[in-house]
């Protein structure tokens, strides 16, 4: 690795930066995620942003001869890009060392490393919700100065080609009550998931079901009608385990479509709204749906269980990440491969298709000693050319760029019934629907626990009042 002083284009510093199986790690780097407080290990770091050190004209080979270390978890995105890494090295002269960590251990390792301030890994895969945890203590670099520096960023990069909801979902100023889209650009979206409904189209056709329900009550009734316990067939699979990840896919998507919100801001404090009339009514219906049409072991379900049941032909519908179900329809991937379809799920009472998303992103370590080569890597990995090539492999869904979706992905996914139409229906209102706040993982896990308690017999209104009171207290500490 070249010394910082000897690398061209820098004055002195060059620093920066669940589907557990190959076929579909959905948003879920989330499955059994140990959450460490952002400030609980290690202190705040104040590493200077490295973008201003890069001068002169843009040149992909400006950091040639350097080496970067990146941290990833096995995932279809990672697998789609792995064969392309040699092209990055040929383009830039930068060598890339990849460390792969199993999803179950990934965020624990990353959290510990960032808190220690070692700068060992220059760039890493990051779920957008983790920005709210890793950003406030200064562990990740603001990438906006890099985007704005024409010496560091190719004029053809076209950041605005990335869907607006994704760009918004990776910005925040860390101020209580302020929405996403404010503050720094803490990561660059790389691949993402809309939480919508996948269904067994072959079985629907067999039953003569041609009209898919466009309101939640009809959706619940369809799920019940599809359920026959004697034939080991049930209507709807969703996550139900005692994890924050139970809330963010189908539950949160339909929750906001029905007009409920998680928090409001009164000018001073966030106020939890899980006990509002709309929230209570929706939650009662959601839990009733699990009892009458969900898996009998719903309280243990994470996304691999839900999508696995769809692929096996046990679940007739799944309300979860589209890119988690997409691979199940590929030849040989599941018993129901070729039989699946997608639709947005029921609209809200006012016809809205608000959708909660998960995005895998690339972020840079604020303590990296190799910031220019790390930025060149992030720029390449999220750029048009490499993303088009990655999508060609057939397991990369969904691309974050409009241009890649409109060309390569539309061609690759053309035979996936309803997938493209569903994507285009929801993309205009797909974003992180949660209110950003630094206690997200703790309070959202508490929400999942409350759902389990209601499933077990607790009164919904009183249990949600208790949850709201506790969460209001936690988020304002």
From Swiss-Prot:
Residues in the signal sequence: 1-38
Description of post-translational modifications: Predicted to be exported by the Tat system. The position of the signal peptide cleavage has not been experimentally proven.
Keywords of this entry: Signal, Sugar transport, Transport
Induction comment: Up-regulated during growth on erythritol, D-threitol or L-threitol relative to growth on glycerol.
GO annotation, biological process: carbohydrate transport; carbohydrate utilization; cellular response to carbohydrate stimulus
GO MF: carbohydrate binding
Phenotype seen when the gene is deleted: Cells lacking this gene are defective for growth on erythritol or on L-threitol.
Annotated TM spans: none
Transcription regulation among keywords: no
Record-linked InterPro entries: Bact_solute-bd_prot1 (IPR050490), SBP (IPR006059), TAT_signal (IPR006311)
UniProt xrefs under Pfam families: SBP_bac_1 (PF01547)
Similarity section: Belongs to the bacterial solute-binding protein 1 family.
Biological function: Part of an ABC transporter complex involved in erythritol/L-threitol import. Binds erythritol and L-threitol. Functions in the transport for the degradation pathways of erythritol and L-threitol, that allow M.smegmatis to grow on these compounds as the sole carbon source.
Protein name per UniProt: Erythritol/L-threitol-binding protein
Gene: eltP
């Amino acid at each position: 690795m070249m010394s910082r002083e000897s690398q061209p284009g820098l004055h002195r510093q060059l620093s920066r930066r669940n589907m557990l199986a190959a076929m579909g790690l959905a948003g879920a780097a989330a499955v059994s995620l140990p959450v460490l407080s952002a400030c609980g290990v290690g202190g705040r770091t104040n590493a200077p942003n490295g973008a201003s050190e890069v001068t002169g004209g843009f040149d992909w080979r400006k950091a040639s001869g350097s080496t970067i270390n990146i941290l990833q978890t096995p995932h279809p995105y990672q697998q789609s890009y792995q064969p392309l890494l040699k092209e990055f090295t040929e383009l830039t002269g930068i060598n890339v060392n990849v460390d792969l960590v199993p999803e179950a251990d990934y965020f624990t390792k990353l959290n510990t490393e960032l808190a220690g301030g070692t700068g060992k890994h220059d760039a890493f895969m990051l779920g957008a919700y983790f920005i709210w945890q890793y950003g406030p203590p200064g562990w990740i670099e603001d990438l906006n100065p890099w985007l704005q520096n024409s010496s560091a960023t190719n004029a053809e990069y076209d950041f605005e080609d990335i869907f607006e909801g994704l760009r918004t979902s990776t910005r925040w100023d860390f101020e209580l009550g302020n929405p996403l889209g404010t503050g720094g650009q803490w990561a660059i979206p790389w691949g993402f998931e809309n939480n919508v409904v996948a269904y067994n189209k072959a079985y629907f056709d067999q039953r003569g079901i041609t009209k898919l329900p466009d309101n939640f009550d009809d959706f619940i009734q369809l799920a019940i009608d599809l359920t026959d316990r004697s034939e080991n067939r049930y209507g709807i699979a969703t996550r139900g385990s005692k994890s924050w990840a139970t809330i963010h896919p189908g539950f949160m998507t339909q929750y906001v479509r029905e007009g409920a919100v998680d928090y409001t801001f009164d000018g001073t404090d966030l106020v939890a709204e899980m006990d509002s009339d709309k929230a209570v009514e929706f939650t009662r219906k959601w839990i009733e749906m699990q009892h009458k049409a969900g898996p009998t072991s719903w309280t243990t379900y994470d996304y691999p269980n839900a999508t696995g049941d769809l692929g096996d032909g046990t679940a007739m519908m799944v309300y979860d990440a589209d890119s988690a179900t997409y691979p199940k329809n590929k030849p040989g991937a599941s018993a129901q491969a070729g039989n699946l379809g997608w639709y947005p799920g029921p609209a809200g009472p006012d016809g809205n298709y608000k959708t909660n998303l998960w995005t895998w992103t690339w972020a840079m370590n604020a303590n990296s000693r190799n910031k220019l080569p790390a930025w060149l890597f992030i720029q390449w990995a999220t750029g048009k050319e490499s993303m088009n090539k990655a999508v060609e492999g057939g397991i990369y869904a969904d691309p974050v760029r409009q241009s890649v979706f409109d060309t390569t992905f539309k061609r690759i996914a053309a035979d996936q019934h309803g997938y493209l139409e569903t994507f285009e229906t929801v993309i205009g209102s797909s974003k992180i629907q949660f209110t950003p706040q630094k206690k997200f993982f703790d309070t959202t896990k508490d929400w999942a626990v409350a759902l389990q308690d209601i499933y077990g017999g607790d009164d919904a209104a009183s249990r949600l009042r208790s949850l709201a009171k506790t969460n209001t207290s936690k988020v304002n500490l």
